[in-house]
Amino acid sequence: MWFYLVTLVGLYYLLRWYRERQVVSHLHDKYVFITGCDSGFGNLLARQLDRRGMRVLAACLTEKGAEELKSKTSDRLETVILDVTNTDSISAATQWVKEHVGDKGLWGLVNNAGVFQAFAYIEWCRPEDCMSIFQVNLIGLAQVTLSMLFLVKKARGRIVNVSSVLGRVALFGGFYSCSKYGVEAFSDVLRREIRDFGVKVSIIEPGSFKTRMTDAELIIEKTKKTWEATPEHIRESYGQQFFDDFCNTTRRELKKCSTNLSLVTDCMEHALTSKYPRTRYSAGWDARLFFIPLSYLPTSLVDCLLAISRRKPAQAV
């Protein structure tokens, strides 16, 4: 019995390995639009796909970021300035992409742009903190997708949305996780709605990686500013010792971030170039061995595990 079961499992993974190694043809003719290319995952992916001969259309937030990227790539790569929170900027970028791709359509749309602000409890945050992070991580992503979807449908291409393991497991830390849960839901709905048009949607769920967005000292500085702006009665309920311990733990965990960004960009590249891309890609050992398994446990058990891993607030009952 066990022999047959192990054999079936082995055959399944062998078949999946074979399917996933099959690559789409004529990659050098395919256009890919990537947001958030100033640094981090987007920057590395743009260079990675350019080396592979694909037609990369890289969106950067700043002129400086665009110029630095152009200096490291071939003449095939084109850049455009894009602010995903600005509808006029999105419309202009869409028209620019349309002019470049012509009748071929857009093979790949990679929604990579994102922000990670203060790592703070929700009660410490202001309503505008919620809006600013949702505006980039979720609303901007949705607006870019809706604006360029007709071009992707024309090519029967791919949409790759960058989420996070915090879109699978809600840990302490405010609205970032909330925005990534939104990305997961948006991507699932979109995938099911447009599959009949030949468009495939993949979600990238990175673990902890060292980018500008996860700079420990910058995040701690923002967290302290958020704490200082929190009403006194809320700060008293948590206590200064709780906050200091929270900052120390955050700093310690952020400094463990992996520097191997290619673990993420390789997943993105596979989603764009494989004939049979996955629905979800978990990137990083912490994602695969901790966060994703944690997401399958009963919610009550996860709550208990997280509760015993942190200091209790000063006025906890």
Curated annotation (Swiss-Prot):
Glycans are attached at N161. The active site is at Y176. Its EC number is 1.1.1.105, 1.1.1.209, 1.1.1.239, 1.1.1.53. It comes from the Eukaryota. Competitively inhibited by 9-cis-retinoic acid and 13-cis-retinoic acid. InterPro entries: NAD(P)-bd_dom_sf, Sc_DH/Rdtase_CS, SDR_fam. Detected in prostate, liver and kidney. Induction: Up-regulated by testosterone. Levels are very low in castrated male rats. Keywords: Endoplasmic reticulum, Glycoprotein, Lipid metabolism, Membrane, Microsome, NAD, Oxidoreductase, Signal, Steroid metabolism. NAD(+) binds at residues 33-57. One of its GO terms (biological process) is androgen metabolic process. Residues 1-17 form the signal peptide. GO terms for molecular function: 5-alpha-androstane-3-beta,17-beta-diol dehydrogenase (NADP+) activity; all-trans-retinol dehydrogenase (NAD+) activity; androstan-3-alpha,17-beta-diol dehydrogenase (NAD+) activity; androsterone dehydrogenase [NAD(P)+] activity; estradiol 17-beta-dehydrogenase [NAD(P)+] activity; testosterone 17-beta-dehydrogenase (NADP+) activity; testosterone dehydrogenase (NAD+) activity. It is an enzyme of class 1 (oxidoreductase). It catalyses: all-trans-retinol--[retinol-binding protein] + NAD(+) = all-trans-retinal--[retinol-binding protein] + NADH + H(+); all-trans-retinol + NAD(+) = all-trans-retinal + NADH + H(+); androsterone + NAD(+) = 5alpha-androstan-3,17-dione + NADH + H(+); testosterone + NAD(+) = androst-4-ene-3,17-dione + NADH + H(+). Pfam families: adh_short. It is a peripheral membrane protein. It is found in: Microsome membrane; Endoplasmic reticulum membrane. Belongs to the short-chain dehydrogenases/reductases (SDR) family. PANTHER family: 17-BETA-HYDROXYSTEROID DEHYDROGENASE TYPE 6, SHORT-CHAIN DEHYDROGENASE/REDUCTASE FAMILY 9C. NAD-dependent oxidoreductase with broad substrate specificity that shows both oxidative and reductive activity (in vitro). Has retinol dehydrogenase activity towards all-trans-retinol (in vitro). Has 17-beta-hydroxysteroid dehydrogenase activity towards various steroids (in vitro). Converts 5-alpha-androstan-3-alpha,17-beta-diol to androsterone and estradiol to estrone (in vitro). Has 3-alpha-hydroxysteroid dehydrogenase activity towards androsterone (in vitro). This is 17-beta-hydroxysteroid dehydrogenase type 6. It comes from Rattus norvegicus. The lineage of its organism: Eukaryota, Metazoa, Chordata, Craniata, Vertebrata.
